[in-house]
From Swiss-Prot:
Its EC number is 7.1.1.-. It is a peripheral membrane protein. The keyword NAD applies. This is NADH-quinone oxidoreductase subunit I. The gene is nuoI. GO terms for molecular function: 4 iron, 4 sulfur cluster binding; iron ion binding; NADH:ubiquinone reductase (non-electrogenic) activity; quinone binding.
C-alpha cells in the first residue's frame, strides 16, 4: 500500500511585500508630513495645561473613580452580593460580608477596590442589582506615592460624592 502525496505550490509573494520596507517608509513619510506641517503652523493645535485647566467637554457617561451610594437612612445600599467582584475582569474588587442582626440581609464589612488593577470598564456598575456602586465622582486622576494609597476601602468609597463633570 503506497501513500499518495500531493504537492501544493504556493503563490510567491513579491520581494517588496516580503520585506515590508515600502510600507514602513510610507507610514513614516505620512508621520513626518503631519509633524512638519504642524510645526510650521501651530495655530490650529489646542493645548490644555492640565491640571490647571480642566477639560470642559467631558460627558456625564465618563467613568471616574468609584463611590458607594447610600439609602435614605444613610446606610450603604450594598448587600455584599459579590456580583460586582464576579463581573470585574481585572479581579480588583474584594468584599467581605457580614450579616445584619435582626435581618436576613448582609452588608459589607470590608469593601476594597485596587485602583492599580482596575481597568475602569464599568462592568461592576452594570452588575450591581442595588445601584450601590457608581463611577460618577468626577475624579479622573489619582496620585499617590505607595501602592497602598491606591487601595480604596469602604470608608473612602462611601465618603465620595457625586461629582460635577
Amino acid at each position: 500500500m503506497a501513500i499518495k502525496t500531493k504537492t501544493i505550490r504556493r503563490k510567491k509573494i513579491p520581494f517588496l511585500q516580503r520585506i515590508y520596507l515600502p510600507f514602513i517608509f510610507a507610514g513614516m513619510a505620512r508621520t513626518f508630513r503631519h509633524f512638519f506641517r504642524n510645526l510650521k503652523d501651530s495655530s490650529n493645535i489646542d493645548f490644555l495645561e492640565y491640571p490647571e485647566q480642566k477639560p470642559t467637554d467631558i460627558t456625564n457617561r465618563y467613568r471616574g473613580l468609584h463611590r458607594l451610594t447610600k439609602n435614605e437612612k444613610g446606610d450603604l445600599k450594598c448587600v455584599a452580593c459579590d456580583m460586582c467582584a464576579t463581573a470585574c475582569p481585572a479581579n480588583c474588587i474584594f468584599i467581605t460580608a457580614t450579616e445584619i442582626e435582626g435581618s436576613k440581609e448582609k452588608a459589607p464589612s470590608k469593601f476594597t477596590i485596587d485602583l492599580l488593577e482596575c481597568v475602569f470598564c464599568g462592568l461592576c456598575v452594570e452588575a450591581c442589582p442595588k445601584d450601590a456602586i457608581r463611577m460618577d465622582t468626577g475624579i479622573f486622576t489619582k496620585v499617590g506615592n505607595t501602592r497602598e494609597s491606591f487601595l480604596a476601602d469602604i470608608k473612602t468609597l462611601s465618603q465620595r460624592e457625586e461629582g460635577s463633570f
